[in-house]
Regions:
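Cys/His-rich short segments
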Residues: 101-245, 249-251
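Generic amphipathic alpha-helical segments used as scaffolds and interaction surfaces in large
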Residues: 109-116, 155, 471, 537-552, ...
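Charged, low-complexity interaction segments
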Residues: 1-67, 184-548, 556, 573, ...
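N-terminal alpha-helical interaction blocks
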Residues: 1-144, 148-158, 164, 174, ...
Length: 679
């Protein structure tokens, strides 16, 4: 196959193991992470050789591309732990190596995928196409060996893949096996060559070239009605784990809506359906306490620095340099030169900070759930908004990432609150893909209000295990952000610190009812494991009216900011925080809007430069107008929420964003709720 470029960030947020990716020649299934890593290690290609050879620090293989983040490692440990038993192996992350990292040409492949689906369509014959299996030389190399092309002395072409596959909410994926579907009436025909004839509209017919049995798409016994009524047999396949396995497993059945009968979970799905593969990502956003090129060079060797400090209590710059030079390949000449140029007091302070950070992380090695991580992020952001970050006593000659003098307050009579806006000059964003689900069909799973996903999260394909360590694929970016929260206001309104305040409406009552129902489910959830309980805790947070208020406002801010910041909408990220203070019983909340990019320079300040009083005042006024009206009203405004559909008044004309921008799958949005709180 020809090479198809994929960015590392795209691999994490949009594709990953188990995903079908469009290529120049058709469709490719990305294998499990273990297969990808083994290919990098053992394929014998130039990329594989360069991947395995030691770098200037003596590191080889995955260690060369390791991402260090203690918070994410704690989250991954929680994700892998079982009730009462913590995960025992080490957990580490690595980034996807690029062609430049492996010193190969941009057109040379690094990773290989499987051809999927394995049925193709030859389109070289007038009036109809021919459906047949690809002739597979290996898992990664195929041809469409059309017998009719051979008979007519026509050179066979690659053809195109069949545009449908079969998938289910348990994560299974398989080809539509045409011999079974066409000959399902008991016909003993063994032919595997079929005609594809379009007969108008969306309908088409698949007909056996030998016995002339056929099946259509829209008929009373067609593919579509079979899919709706649960009559497509699921064989329980995970082709990203074993592409050769076919019809070897089984899958549980469900009650089919409308019929009340038990049936298959399998559904007919288009290749390009976004719900066919929905990644499960963990995200950690932090304001670095220390940063800079020298920090990034020294941080991976923090254990070495700790040993030097233990040996030399009265450490000076000359002694430190002598010890580092004795380590040979551990440190590059560029690092040594940077150390020599750095003033001694700044250098020793940096080394002490790095070692102190290591000691703190080693002591704080408890598992961390997603909801706990979000609460930690909110606490640190609120503290930064109050005192700046790092606090003034620690800044020295370093620049502050949150400068207290840059924070502004914007009274908003439109929303009835006073916003505090804190520009954050540098953020570190870590994303790790830990699984995926297949969000397809409408089964009884869709009625499960305790989960934002219809499909079951499958995590077996998304890690690689060696003897001592479980590795996950991650992505590390540097960026900037704007944190927005609410402060005490003199505006005469029902808001205050809580944007909902004393407001009351049917919409707010409905959201409160949903929130209370989910809370009751959590209280009685004795059979749930820790990961499932954490997912339910997040659903409770996301259905809180305060969260919905902030999330709806955040989307409107993003849609307006993209016009003025020069940053495309898909490059933005969002974090919505809502945490109940156990001491006071009140809610702390806010939003973080950020943009990040690979490399030490991040996004160069285009976002934080917009934090200016006149601009932000106008921005909130514009957003309030967009909250009140939508070009799709009254259709949009009449959408009402319920327990099984917790999306209120929102549509693509006013609120919905791309999947890569919204961290919450465009759920828990409601313009009506925000309107009910406006003066």
């Amino acid at each position: 196959m020809d090479v198809t470029p994929i960015r590392p960030s795209q691999f994490i947020t949009r594709t990953g193991p188990g995903a079908l990716t469009p290529t120049v020649e058709g469709s490719m299934l990305i294998p499990q992470l273990s297969t990808l890593v083994q290919e990098l290690m053992n394929s014998g290609t130039k990329a594989s050789v360069n991947f395995s050879e030691p770098d200037s620090f003596g590191k080889t293989g995955l260690q060369k591309f390791e991402i260090n983040d203690s918070r994410m490692e704690r989250m991954l440990r929680h994700f892998n732990s079982k009730p009462g038993k913590s995960f025992e192996k080490n957990i580490k992350m690595f980034r996807l190596p690029t062609n430049a990292d492996l010193r190969i040409k941009e057109i040379d492949p690094i990773l290989k995928g499987f051809i999927f689906p394995r049925w193709g369509l030859c389109t070289q014959h007038k009036g109809y196409g021919l459906v047949m299996q690809f002739s597979q030389k290996s898992n990664f190399e195929i041809i469409l060996d059309c017998p009719k092309c051979r008979d007519q002395n026509i050179v066979p072409i690659r053809g195109s893949p069949i545009r449908f596959v079969q998938a289910c909410t348990n994560g299974h994926l398989q080809d539509l096996y045409w011999p079974y579907l066409v000959h399902s009436g008991g016909n003993n025909c063994t032919s595997k060559l079929f005609e594809w004839r379009d007969i108008g509209g969306d309908n088409f017919i698949i007909k056996c070239t030998k016995c002339r049995e056929q099946i259509d798409y829209l008929g009373s016994n067609g593919l579509k009605i079979r899919s709706i009524n649960g009559r497509l047999k699921c064989q329980g396949n995970f082709p990203e784990i074993n592409i050769q396995a076919y019809a070897q497993g089984s899958c549980s059945q469900v009650i089919i809506p409308g019929t009340g009968m038990m049936g298959s979970r399998a559904k007919l799905v288009m290749l390009n359906s976004t719900g066919l593969h929905t990644p499960k990502n963990l995200t950690s956003v932090q304001i670095p306490s220390i940063s800079g090129p020298l920090y990034r060079e020294l941080f991976p060797h923090r254990a070495v620095l700790k040993s030097i400090l233990l040996l030399k209590h009265d450490l000076d710059k000359i002694t430190l340099l002598d010890h580092l030079k004795q380590l040979g390949t551990e440190f590059t000449n560029d690092t040594i030169n940077e150390i020599e140029r750095t003033p001694e007091n700044e250098l020793l302070s940096l080394v002490n900070d790095i070692v102190s950070e290591l000691t703190t992380n080693n002591k704080n090695n408890k598992t961390l759930s997603e909801s706990q991580s979000n609460d930690e992020e909110l606490t640190s952001l609120l503290e930064a908004a109050r005192t700046g970050y790092p606090p003034s006593a620690k800044i020295g000659k370093k620049h502050a990432y949150v400068n207290i003098e840059d924070i502004i307050k914007i009274p908003s009579p439109e929303f009835g609150v006073t916003f505090r806006i804190s520009p954050i000059k540098e953020l570190r964003v870590i994303k790790t893909q830990v699984g995926y689900s297949r969000e397809i069909g409408t089964t009884d799973d869709a009625l499960d209000s305790t989960n934002s996903r219809v499909g079951t999260i499958k995590k077996e394909s998304n890690h690689y295990d060696d003897d001592t360590t479980r590795w996950y694929l991650g992505d590390e970016n540097i960026g900037e952000g704007i944190f927005i929260d609410i402060i005490e206001s003199e505006i005469n309104n029902p808001g205050g610190l809580n944007p909902i305040g004393s407001s009351s409406s049917n919409n707010i009552d409905t959201w409160n009812s949903i929130n209370s129902t989910l809370d009751d489910i959590l209280t009685n959830s004795v059979d749930y494991d820790e990961v499932k309980k954490d997912e339910l805790k997040q659903e409770i947070t996301h259905s809180n009216p305060t969260f919905v208020w902030w999330h709806t406002l955040c989307h409107k801010l993003l849609l307006n900011l993209t016009v003025d910041s020069g940053i495309s909408l898909v490059s933005f990220g969002e974090r919505v925080y809502c945490k109940k203070n156990t001491r006071t019983g009140k809610y702390q909340s806010g939003i973080l809007i950020y943009s990040s990019a690979t490399g030490s320079d991040g996004t160069l300040g285009g976002l934080v430069s917009l934090v200016e009083e006149q601009f932000m005042t106008k921005l909130f006024k514009t957003c309030s107008q967009g909250i009140v009206s939508c070009s799709n009203d009254p259709v949009c405004s009449e959408r009402k929420i319920e327990l099984t559909k917790i999306e209120g008044a929102c549509c693509h004309a006013c609120e919905l964003l791309s999947e890569t921008t919204c961290s919450y799958q465009n759920r828990c949005l409601d313009r009506n709720l925000v309107q009910d709180t406006m003066p």
